[in-house]
Design a protein with these regions (language model features):
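Hydrophobic positions on the alpha1 helix immediately C-terminal to the Walker A/P-loop
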Residues: 58
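Conserved small/polar residues in nucleotide/adenosyl-binding loops
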Residues: 169-176
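Walker A (P-loop) phosphate-binding loop of P-loop NTPases
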Residues: 52
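Conserved lysine of the Walker
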Residues: 55
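Charged, amphipathic alpha-helical linker segments immediately N-terminal to NTP-binding catalytic cores
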Residues: 1-25
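Short beta-strand-centered segment that lines the nucleotide-binding/catalytic pocket of NTP-utilizing
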Residues: 72-84
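Conserved nucleotide-sensing/catalytic segment adjacent to the nucleotide-binding pocket
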Residues: 84-132
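Glycine-rich phosphate-binding loop used to anchor ATP phosphates in small-molecule kinases
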Residues: 114-168
Length: 178
């Protein structure tokens, strides 16, 4: 089996397992394999998109593909694992008189200092690196952390990746109590 045929089959089989849907080999060749080839020598990748748009699916496909064909270790960080605790978000909501911060998701509800620390340590290869794991059922971090000891490609995925929160001054000046 040629390398291109192996990559086509692997990608198609992986997408079926991840999504339950069959993607044509033409679409895989024209889109997925081009993207995967383009990423081969990258060290970092940010994937942003709305909820349910396929960020996690694409991240897992990249991880599996890179391990199989390039022997590279891909680490996937989800911005979701860096949410502030429920208590911290409620405190922000009271402080700024808006319930926007009570729910997860909007810019300003993540622990960006910890995210920067973790990503910097991963990029500097200061292993091991411990990554928080957020439990959406309890709306708080789990009691354990994921241990990472190697990274060749770091993927950060989330729906507001790179978005900046509205300034606190602006929020105070435009209090509406949403």
């Amino acid at each position: 089996m040629s390398e291109i045929t192996a990559k086509l089959k692997f990608t198609q089989d992986t997408l079926i397992r991840l999504t339950g849907k069959k993607v044509s080999q033409k679409e895989i060749k024209d889109h997925y394999l081009k993207l995967l080839s383009h990423l081969k020598h990258k060290k970092t990748l940010m994937i942003a998109g709305s909820q349910g748009s396929g960020k996690s699916t694409l991240s897992v496909l990249i991880k599996k593909f890179f391990l199989k064909f390039y022997s590279k270790n891909v680490v996937i960080l989800s911005i979701d694992d860096f949410y502030l605790s429920s208590f911290q978000r409620k405190r922000l909501a009271r402080k700024f008189n808006t319930d926007l911060f009570e729910t997860r998701g909007v810019p300003g509800t993540h622990n960006l200092k910890l995210l920067y620390k973790v990503t910097n340590n991963l990029m500097k290869k200061e292993f091991p690196v411990y990554v928080p794991v957020f439990d959406k059922v309890t709306d708080n971090k789990k009691n354990y952390k994921r241990k990472i000891s190697k990274v060749d490609l770091l993927i950060l995925e989330g729906w507001c990746v790179g978005s900046k929160p509205v300034s606190y001054t602006h929020l105070r000046a435009h209090e509406t109590g949403y």
